[in-house]
């Protein structure tokens, strides 16, 4: 393993010298395939089809000389066919890890009673660790880890899941030394799982009491980076499904083709990989390719067979850095004591409709800046606080769905409707100011500066780890920031004073504070912020 990691570092050194980004900002790609042995929704021949899918994925990676991460659900791990496949045919340097969905054979091996309808039941209260007590979670971890070591000779270093609770993740790290985890992208309601407002891409150190929430301190964090999965379109994924109970999907998944975009559309794949390889990312960028075998080979084949050679080509060109999930986890821990600031910058959109999107994340907040032509708004701002304990940390979830959220200041999805696009806009004389010719500039390791032109002067937006700055220093007219939402939106805001606004999200109190500027309540919007000396500065750190 030391030799493998040394090789990775050498590749990083070569790759980082070749692309336009800063030398300390590698663009990692993980090919992660997670493996189930059973899928009750498929019908006859299900087990054979699932196995055939995984075998074909592995063969294609071998053909193009790529290493992958294969994460095994318990039922697949104890199946001799998968054991032989991965022991004999898996390419050197690839990785076998754990996929943390809970199945009937896993539960029964732990001496617990299975409560599901099927041997694998995807509902939150039986199919995920959140549906079990803390003591049950420990037993489930112990049984899996010992069986894995019995089969493969070591404990897994990577554990993935659509979502995983902090108690389980912390226990895995302390007792078994896992080095990396991965969790589903942000989504609202898809499959009954809501993960909303989190660190948008790349990776973060999670809170000890909430695995979805980035931690702010070393004492408050689990020292295992959580990587966000599936490769969301930074322009179109967010708004997909506004006005409905569930988001659509525009991701790198090889089966995806929502609205003519996604991982089965060659042009979109090329656009996405190019954007992630060349756009400004600050500390590093991260792409997860691959697919769960439940979608079956015939459905994913076309997209998978296009993506793998495209990825191989970009690795050969030095634009992407190939790594397993655990290698990324070790690199992250070697380079960051705390969650770094990262960004995803889409300077155009696949449909060529003059849309742009910038995602910025730090350990304190995330923000999305969005353009539709020159029309600009902050589409999303969510704050992070490691003290917000998950509903599932110390008690089992009892519902078939689940919910993980953070602390919203702006939510352009939940507070919008088909008629109203919610957002925080720059306004002058009651009209939204367009921001033309935006330029994105990196300042140091953690700051993005966005410059552009408005009718009242040049605007400068600065995204720092602990604050957001909006300034038009030599304005030719009055301006302000205004939050507009759909009138029916459920908002978290409470008492407002000139320098602070109180808020509450599912019973957790937080505040929004201004370093410069002042809050004003107004009848034509939810609230406004008036600048001071040409600037508005939000403090994004939740006070202790």
Residue ranges and their predicted role:
Residues 446-492:
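Acidic, contiguous internal or C-terminal segments within carbohydrate-active enzymes
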Residues 369-448, 456:
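Acidic-aromatic substrate-binding/catalytic surfaces of carbohydrate-active enzymes
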Residues 36, 52, 56, 146, ...:
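Catalytic grooves of carbohydrate-active enzymes
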């Amino acid at each position: 393993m030391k030799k493998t990691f040394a090789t990775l570092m050498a590749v990083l050194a070569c790759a980082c010298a070749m692309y336009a980004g800063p030398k300390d900002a590698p663009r990692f790609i993980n090919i992660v395939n997670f493996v189930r042995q059973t899928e009750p929704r498929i019908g006859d021949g299900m087990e054979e089809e699932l196995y055939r899918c995984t075998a074909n994925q592995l063969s294609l990676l071998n053909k193009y000389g790529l290493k992958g991460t294969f994460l095994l659900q318990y039922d697949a791990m104890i199946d001799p066919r998968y054991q032989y496949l991965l022991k004999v045919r898996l390419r050197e340097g690839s990785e076998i890890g754990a996929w943390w969905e809970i199945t009937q054979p896993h539960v029964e091996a732990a001496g617990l009673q299975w409560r599901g309808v099927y041997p694998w039941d995807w509902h939150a209260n039986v199919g995920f660790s959140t549906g079990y007590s803390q003591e049950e979670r420990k037993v489930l971890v112990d049984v899996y880890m010992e069986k894995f070591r019995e089969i493969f000779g070591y404990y897994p270093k990577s554990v993935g899941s659509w979502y995983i609770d902090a108690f389980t993740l912390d226990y895995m790290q302390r007792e078994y030394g896992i080095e990396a985890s991965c969790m589903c992208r942000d989504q609202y309601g898809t499959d009954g799982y809501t993960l909303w407002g989190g660190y948008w891409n790349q990776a973060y150190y999670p809170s000890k009491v909430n695995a979805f929430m980035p931690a702010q301190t070393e004492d408050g964090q689990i020292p295992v980076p959580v990587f966000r999965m599936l490769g969301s379109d930074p322009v179109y994924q967010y708004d997909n499904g506004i006005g409905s109970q569930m988001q659509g999907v525009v991701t790198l998944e090889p089966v995806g083709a929502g609205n003519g975009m996604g991982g089965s559309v060659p042009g979109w794949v090329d656009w996405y990989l190019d954007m992630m390889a060349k756009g400004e990312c600050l500390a590093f960028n991260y792409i997860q390719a691959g697919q769960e075998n439940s979608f079956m080979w015939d459905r994913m084949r076309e997209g998978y067979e296009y993506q793998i050679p495209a990825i191989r080509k970009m690795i050969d060109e030095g634009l992407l850095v190939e790594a397993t999930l655990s290698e990324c986890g070790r690199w992250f821990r070697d380079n960051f004591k705390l969650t770094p600031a990262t960004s995803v910058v889409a300077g155009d959109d696949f449909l060529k409709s003059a849309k742009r999107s910038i995602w910025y994340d730090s350990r304190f907040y995330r923000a999305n800046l969005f353009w539709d032509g020159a029309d600009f708004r902050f589409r999303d701002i969510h704050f992070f606080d490691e003290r917000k304990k998950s509903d599932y940390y110390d008690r089992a979830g009892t519902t078939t769905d689940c919910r993980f959220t953070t602390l919203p200041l702006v939510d352009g999805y939940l507070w919008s409707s088909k008629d109203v696009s919610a957002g925080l806009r720059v306004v002058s004389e009651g009209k939204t100011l367009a921001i033309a010719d935006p330029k994105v500039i990196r300042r140091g390791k953690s700051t993005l500066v966005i410059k552009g032109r408005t009718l009242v002067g040049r605007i400068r937006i600065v995204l720092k780890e602990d604050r957001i700055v909006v300034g038009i220093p030599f304005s030719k007219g009055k301006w302000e920031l205004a939050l507009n939402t759909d009138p029916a939106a459920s908002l978290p805001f409470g008492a407002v004073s000139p320098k602070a606004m109180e808020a509450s999200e599912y019973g957790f109190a937080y505040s929004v504070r201004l370093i410069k500027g002042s809050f004003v309540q107004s009848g034509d919007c939810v609230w406004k912020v008036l600048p001071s000396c040409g600037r508005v500065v939000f403090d994004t750190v939740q006070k202790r």
